[in-house]
């Protein structure tokens, strides 16, 4: 099987679809035409730029360039995960960046080195960059949802947490329920995705592979690997960020440092 | 331990807020001996709650040292310390579930693992408080303010602490409920008056006279009388 290599005219034809959104906006007086146009331009520019960067990275094929790109992607994901949290505390950025970095790189390294094996090098950009990107995008959700849940529960259940401490609970015993709740909440989106994958929707990567001519079963195998990779990375990342935050908000004297949390 | 050695000793405790460059608690020194019933009075914002929280080691101190039976409180002894010196919030915090489940709750903590929930003891206290045993099966959500405070008190009392730190336990209660709480605390104290100690924050002068034999007066983050 082969795939249809799109010409610029074909891409332009697809751009006509966005006119539907414009027409709806005008008909219902939503006033979204400008935003829509800007979003469309950004889509083209951002994807174009990333395409150029990837072409160059694929061509150069140097480990340090791949590593630099992955580091940049991880930093941006870590900062975004922290920004999405409604509440702040000192060290929140460190926590999100470190947990995303450790979880996504470890799990992706396992897939590259143990599962795929046949890559010509550990940093082969064709595999390393899209895998890390996909894992980061999904883990970022789990991280921010888990972190949000943790700080929200600590704030709304402050009296319960302190009550446990006053009765002799260690810091871990006092925080266990909010920690468990946060990790569970952070993992809900990926578990939901795993439950309906292939039934409700075909994942983007699998769709891409099918469009590019890959046999369905081959695409399915890749997708299974990816789902497990994303699930493990999300779990590790959520646990990591919640535990690091626990250490920031409860000191070794078994005190709950509630004042560190700001809105 | 000699009898005259204090259970708790605070030396030069201080709590500081860098943002406002203000000491909320400063140069607070205090000795608490076994068998004492102390009431802490003072205007709002004078540092009464902060003093009690500091005595329970709930917040990081910016100055001073807290001694428990002659030894400085350190991270290694904190859960054990808090199992002997129990602080009760003004608004009782209860877990979802029945009164009985709330009373059993502390026994899951490792510091209490060697102990068992003593239903007979709780029933004895309930009889003293003229409450039916089915009180234990009530949901914590259905309790009145007074009942919730009594549940929190029973939960603390059953751990047989040396010191109860009570932060205005009757401030939000009607007179009848307040009387129940006072009765509950008095009952616990009278069972071993030589070993048990109460430090009680109160705004009520009559209550202070009823419940305490020593009064500390606080103002602007300092103890100005009675230390």
Residue ranges: model-predicted function:
Chain B
Residues 2-10, 14-27:
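A short, flexible loop at the N-terminus of ABC-type nucleotide-binding domains that lies
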Residues 56:
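Helix-to-loop junction immediately C-terminal to a conserved catalytic motif
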Residues 64-73, 81:
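Conserved ABC transporter NBD signature motif
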Residues 91-101, 111-113:
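Conserved catalytic motifs of ABC-family nucleotide-binding domains
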Residues 116-135:
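Conserved ABC ATPase "signature" region
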Residues 139-143, 147:
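Conserved ABC ATPase signature
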Residues 156-157:
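ABC ATPase C-loop
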Residues 164-168:
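Catalytic Walker B motif of ABC-type/P-loop ATPase nucleotide-binding domains
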């Amino acid at each position: 099987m082969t795939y249809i290599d799109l010409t610029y005219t074909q891409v332009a034809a697809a751009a006509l679809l966005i006119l539907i959104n414009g027409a709806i906006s005008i008909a219902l007086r939503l006033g979204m035409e400008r935003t829509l146009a800007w979003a469309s331009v950004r889509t083209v520019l951002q994807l174009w730029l990333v395409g150029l960067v990837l072409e160059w990275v694929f061509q150069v094929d140097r480990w340090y360039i791949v590593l630099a790109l992955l580091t940049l992607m991880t930093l941006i994901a870590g900062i975004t995960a922290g920004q999405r949290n409604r509440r702040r505390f000192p060290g929140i950025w460190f926590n999100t960046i470190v947990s995303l970095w450790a979880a996504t790189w470890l799990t992706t390294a396992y897939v590259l080195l143990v599962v795929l094996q046949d890559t010509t090098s550990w940093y082969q950009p064709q595999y390393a960059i899209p895998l890390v990107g996909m894992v980061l995008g999904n883990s970022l959700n789990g991280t921010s949802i888990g972190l949000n849940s943790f700080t929200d529960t600590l704030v709304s259940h402050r009296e319960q947490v302190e009550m446990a401490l006053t009765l002799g609970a260690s810091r871990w015993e006092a925080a266990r329920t909010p920690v468990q709740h946060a990790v569970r909440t952070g993992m809900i989106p990926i578990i939901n995705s795993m439950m309906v994958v292939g039934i409700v929707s075909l994942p983007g990567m699998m769709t891409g592979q099918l469009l590019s001519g890959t046999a369905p079963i081959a695409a399915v195998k890749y997708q299974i690997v990816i789902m497990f990779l994303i699930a493990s990375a999300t779990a590790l990342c959520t646990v990591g960020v919640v535990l690091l935050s626990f250490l920031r908000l409860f000191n070794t004297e078994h005190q709950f440092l509630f004042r560190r949390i700001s809105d | 331990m000699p009898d005259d050695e204090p259970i708790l000793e605070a030396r030069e405790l201080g709590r500081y807020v860098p943002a406002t460059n203000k000491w909320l608690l400063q140069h607070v020194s205090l000795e608490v001996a076994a068998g004492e019933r102390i009431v802490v009075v003072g205007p709002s914002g004078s540092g009464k709650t902060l003093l009690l929280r500091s005595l329970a080691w709930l917040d990081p101190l910016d100055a001073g040292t807290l001694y428990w039976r002659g030894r400085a409180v350190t991270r290694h002894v904190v859960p054990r310390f808090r199992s002997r010196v129990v602080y009760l919030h003004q608004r009782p915090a209860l877990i979802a579930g029945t009164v009985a489940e709330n009373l059993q709750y502390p026994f899951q903590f490792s510091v209490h693992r060697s102990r068992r929930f003593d239903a007979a003891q709780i029933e004895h206290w309930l009889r003293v408080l003229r409450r039916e045993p089915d009180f234990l099966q009530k949901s914590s959500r259905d309790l009145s303010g007074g009942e919730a405070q009594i549940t929190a008190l029973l939960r603390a009392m059953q751990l047989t602490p040396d010191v109860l730190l009570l932060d205005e336990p009757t401030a939000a209660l009607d007179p009848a409920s307040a009387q129940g709480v006072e009765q509950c605390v008095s009952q616990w104290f009278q069972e071993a008056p030589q070993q048990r100690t109460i430090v009680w924050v109160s705004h009520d002068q009559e209550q202070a006279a009823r419940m305490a034999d020593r009064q500390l007066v606080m103002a602007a983050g300092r103890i100005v009388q009675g230390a």
